[in-house]
């Protein structure tokens, strides 16, 4: 696939939008409630399949207006979606230089080691299995947000690594 032009800089990470790529309406509803319960201040944008995720990230079609659909600071992505699955989106992202440091966290019901391995091979920063209990989902989302969008974490990363490398997969102690 063809590379896109340089993307505009995203918002400061602690308030950066989060893009959720999820096809299940019940999971979308629960995620929205869990975001509210966790007190996550980041705006949440939802796409319903992998093709919409690519369109959103590339600013194509309905997502061309960057004021209305700003670049996210974090992507939460299901694997099993119609039109284009999470693996296809990860492969597309790997070819898009401007998204080299965009954290993508796979959030799926699959516990298969092959899915975990393939996600990591394709560049996922993290892999989380959707919990069964709502309170566990709240904790998981808060943990993911703190790990990938917390300014303290990102300052640590910027000071301790070269800028071409992806941040580490775990929050420093």
Predicted regions and their residues:
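Non-catalytic signal-transmission and effector/linker regions of two-component phosphorelay proteins
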Residues: 1-19, 25-45, 51-54, 58, ...
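Receiver (REC) domain active-site loop signature in two-component systems and cognate sites
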Residues: 79-81
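Conserved phosphotransfer active-site motifs of two-component signaling proteins
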Residues: 111-114
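Short, glycine/charged-rich "phosphate-handling" switch motifs in NTP-dependent
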Residues: 125
């Amino acid at each position: 696939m063809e590379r896109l032009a340089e993307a505009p800089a995203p918002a400061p990470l602690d308030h950066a939008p989060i893009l959720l790529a999820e096809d299940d309406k019940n999971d979308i509803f629960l995620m929205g409630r869990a975001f509210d319960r966790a007190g996550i201040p980041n705006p949440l944008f939802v796409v319903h399949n992998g093709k919409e995720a690519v369109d959103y990230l590339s600013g194509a079609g309905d997502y061309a207006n960057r004021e209305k659909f700003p670049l996210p600071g974090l992507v939460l992505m299901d694997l099993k979606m119609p039109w284009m699955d999470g693996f296809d989106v990860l492969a597309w992202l790997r070819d898009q230089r401007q998204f080299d440091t965009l954290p993508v966290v796979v959030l799926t019901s699959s516990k298969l080691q092959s899915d975990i391995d393939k996600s990591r091979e394709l560049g996922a920063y993290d892999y989380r299995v959707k919990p069964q209990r709502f309170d566990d989902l709240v904790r998981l989302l808060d943990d993911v947000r703190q790990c990938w969008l917390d300014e303290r974490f990102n300052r640590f990363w910027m000071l301790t690594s070269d800028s071409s490398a992806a941040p580490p997969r775990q929050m420093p102690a």
